[in-house]
């Protein structure tokens, strides 16, 4: 079996330290903590009141509002970081064979925010005709959906 060469040409990052790779790196070398008070949900009933949340993130930098509504927040992070990596690589996508371009990213659980919203929303509604889940519930939630959204 012949091994193919892989070349990393660009990097991107969305982290609690910053929404770009330079911001994140700056935070790392300066010993900055990404931890702070939980703001994404009401954590008043939990012992822990702090987390490492991504702050100041604007998904509309890489996609329109209509597309962004179909994605869980983690997918928006992945898509944005992939776009940063493409920009960092200074690739002219009109001149590249897109079948030879790939992005590697990792997520432990996927769309937990979507899962939370749907399940908690369902628990609050007493409806005799059954559950009324968002039709994008599963596509937004599954962890491999972010790599299906193209930025190229």
Kindly give the residue locations of the regions a language model identified.
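Conserved "HGTGT" condensation-loop signature of ketosynthase/thiolase-family condensing enzymes
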Residues: 1-152
């Amino acid at each position: 079996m012949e091994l193919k060469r892989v070349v990393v040409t660009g990097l991107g990052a969305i982290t609690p330290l910053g929404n770009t790779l330079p911001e994140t790196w700056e935070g790392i070398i300066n010993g900055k903590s990404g931890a702070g008070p939980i703001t994404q949900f009401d954590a008043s009933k939990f012992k822990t009141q702090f987390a490492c949340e991504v702050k100041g993130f604007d998904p509309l930098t890489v996609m329109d509002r209509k597309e962004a509504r179909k994605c869980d927040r983690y997918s928006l992070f992945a898509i944005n970081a992939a776009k940063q990596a493409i920009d960092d690589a200074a690739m002219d996508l009109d001149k590249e064979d897109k079948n030879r371009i790939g992005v590697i990213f990792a997520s432990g659980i996927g769309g937990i925010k979507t899962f939370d919203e749907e399940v908690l929303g369902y628990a609050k509604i007493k409806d005799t005709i059954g559950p009324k889940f968002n039709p994008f519930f599963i596509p937004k939630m599954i962890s491999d959906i972010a790599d299906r959204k193209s930025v190229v």
